[in-house]
Structures are given as C-alpha cells and as structure tokens.
Amino acid sequence: LKVLSTIHKIPFRALQRMTLLNPGAVDLVKLLAMLAMLLDHFNTLFLSPLRPELYALGRAAFPLFSLIWAINVNRKPERLQFQANRLWLWAVVTQPVFMLAFRQLDPWYALNILFVFAGTTQLLAWHRQSGTCGLAAGTALLAVLAWPLSPASYGLQGEILTVGLAVIAGSASAQVRYCAGWAVFLSLVTLNGASHLATMPVATLVFATLPTCLFPWMVVTAAQQLMADKHRRWLPARFFYPVYAGHLLLAGTIVYFV
C-alpha cells in the first residue's frame, strides 16, 4: 500500500517541482516555448507534408505557456482582474490575424490561444472577488469557450490544464493541489492526438502524447539547472503579446499573398 501511495503521488510531485522556477528560469522557459510555437506554426502553415519531428517539438509550447501563466497569476493575485482585462484585449486584437493565418486550416469560429488564458484568468479573478458564485460564473464562461477553442487551442483539456497548474502553483490545500495534479496529468495525456490512439497508436504516442508530457518536463528541468543563480528577469516585460500577434500577422500575410 505504501508503494502504491508513493506511485500515486509521482505526477503531483513532478508537476509541483516544475512550478518552482526563479525569474531567470521563467524567461528561459518562455523563450523556448515561443521557439516551439514558431516551429510548430511554420510546420503547419508552410510545409507539406508536415514534418513529424517539428510537430512533436511543437507539442511542448502550450503546456509551457500554461505553466508560465500559472506561475505569474499566483505572484500577484490582487491584480487578477487587471491581468484578465489585458488578456481579453490582446486576445481580441490578435483574433483577426489569427484568422488570416489559419483561414485555410481552421473553421471561422476557432479562437486563438490567448482566449484560453483570458478565460481562465477571469475565472480566478471572479473566484477571488465572489467566492463560490464567481467560481460558478467562471466555470460557465469556460464551458462556453470550450467549443470555439477546440479546433485550434486545445478546448476543454487546455482549460483544465491551465486551471490545474494555477491550483498547483497556488496556496490551496495539499489535497486540492493533489487532485489538480491528476487533472493536469490526465489533460496532458489527452491534449494531443487522443482521438487517433485507436487507429495510429504508435505514431500518436511517439509524436503527440509522449512529447506533450516529456518535452515540457525536459525544458523546465534544464531551465532550473541552467538558471539556478539567475534571480532577475532578462526578457522584456510582456513581450509575448506583440511577438505572438506579430508572427501571426507575418505568417498570415505570406499565406495570403503566396
């Protein structure tokens, strides 16, 4: 029984260790996540057929961005509504260029990834402001967003992943964080390619499921070791938003005219 209890706690302990990043390591993880995203979008938009190794590398981007988001929202919880407002603004501003870039691949109603973080930040803000009623309102908001987020931005699994990581990185009770750890683990396992496991089990495991789980852990572990003594940020504040919108604008323009 003791062995089983230890095994059950492995995913939670691994995820909890991943949230322990100093500011320098956070910036390195953010930079590598952006690189993975750029490679994935280049592969998706400009290569035919897709390169499976680039697809696999791209699976690390969303979990890493979610981890950085979870760490950031827990640093200044009193600013959650301000952070939500900023995310909603950037999500709306970015949506036209997202639609331009992916107009041939995703349906018109598909939302960009910033809506995931805007919705989950709004849930946390409402929960902080109004308790159970705020939590219910935030859950309803995420339920509404899940469908338009599904084609391109990970849908329900992505929402569960982000909220779960925020709980693990926060100050909730050990039991709540333990349950959140399992929710995060299950969302990671099903985040990419779960619908293809029955028909293409080997390819799905090698290029989707395992990279989604292992690559983020490898990146975070490397960042923790390389940046162990870097306790100051070295990237410009909030540089992700213009880079995200800008690369979509550039990619969309190329796709449209070429």
What are these regions (language model features)?
Residues 1-258:
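Alpha-helical transmembrane segments and their immediate juxtamembrane cytosolic regions
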